[in-house]
Every structure is written in structure tokens, then in C-alpha cells.
Curated annotation (Swiss-Prot):
Stretches for region Disordered: 1-24
Purpose of the protein: Binds directly to 16S ribosomal RNA.
InterPro entries: Ribosomal_bS20 (IPR002583), Ribosomal_bS20_sf (IPR036510)
Pfam family, one: Ribosomal_S20p
GO molecular-function terms, A-Z: small ribosomal subunit rRNA binding; structural constituent of ribosome
Similarity remark: Belongs to the bacterial ribosomal protein bS20 family.
The species this protein was found in: Bordetella avium (strain 197N)
Protein name: Small ribosomal subunit protein bS20
GO biological process: translation
Superkingdom field: Bacteria
Length: 87
């Protein structure tokens, strides 16, 4: 239990940050799933468009340090390779 005013405030901030970060992580996972679903359908145009949107989401989440920049690069690289493999 937080005893000082500062500790109580930090506890409140932590709860709010956790909600916000969870929302961003969920948005990231959803964007990645949408690209994978588009790849599964085999439509390169739709997959390319969803990849563009997902790349934006991945970069935003990485910029906010929700995920590491290398993890973001890995996600983008693998998704782009999968979209490129569609012929």
C-alpha cells in the first residue's frame, strides 16, 4: 500500500499507463493478424494495403517504447516478406 502522496500518485499513474499500453499492444496484435489474414486469402493488393497500415501501427508502438525497435523491425520484415512472396 502506498503511504506517501507521491507513492499514491505514482500508483494511479501506473494503472493508467498500464491501460494505455495494453490498448496499444492489442492494436498492434490486431494489425498483425489482419495482415496475416489478408495473406491467407492470397490477395496481394489487400495484403499490401493492410501491411502499409500495420507498418504504421508497428512504428508508432515502437516509438512509444511499448515494444523494442528491433522487434518492430522483425515484425515488419517478416510480414513484408510474406506479402512479397504472394505471386
Amino acid at each position: 500500500m502506498a503511504n506517501t502522496a507521491q507513492a499514491r500518485k505514482r500508483a494511479r499513474q501506473s494503472v493508467e499507463r498500464n491501460k494505455h499500453n495494453s490498448s496499444l499492444r492489442s492494436m498492434l496484435r490486431t494489425a498483425i493478424k489482419r495482415v496475416r489474414q489478408a495473406i491467407a486469402t492470397g490477395d496481394k493488393a489487400v495484403a499490401g494495403e493492410t501491411l502499409r497500415k500495420a507498418s504504421s501501427v508497428i512504428d508508432r508502438v515502437a516509438d512509444k517504447n511499448i515494444i523494442h525497435k528491433n522487434k518492430a523491425a522483425r515484425h515488419k520484415s517478416r510480414l513484408a516478406a510474406a506479402v512479397k512472396a504472394l505471386a
